[in-house]
């Protein structure tokens, strides 16, 4: 089961508020300024892990993820604020925000499991392992660059905006 998926290295685990695509480096200061203004009304909050699941909702899963639990509404508010500001700059997001941390992606050309229901296998693998007490403080928004390589993505921090009252 696990050989058909490429797991995300722990240092790359993150929640994407909005994917921007290719961005000129000269735009980074303005992006950070717009993000800062858009989140000025949002204070730091606690976010907890939720349940494991997979995308898409039907058929063979391509992405294995863990959702968020307590604090998800505050995270959605943060995402809405950031997306609204970036949309005004011309960065349109065609997918609705789905709060999740990607754990693994199906490798290209990965085989089928035949009669095995992959989705149930994934959920059974994580049954009872959710950590509802695993929480952390959301105190900043990072602007990250993602460079894709055959071995996976490499992330570089381009900037950071603290939530008011955050570090």
Regions found by a protein language model. Give the residues of each.
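Histidine-dependent nucleotide/RNA phosphoesterase domain, centered on the 2H-phosphoesterase fold
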Residues: 1-167
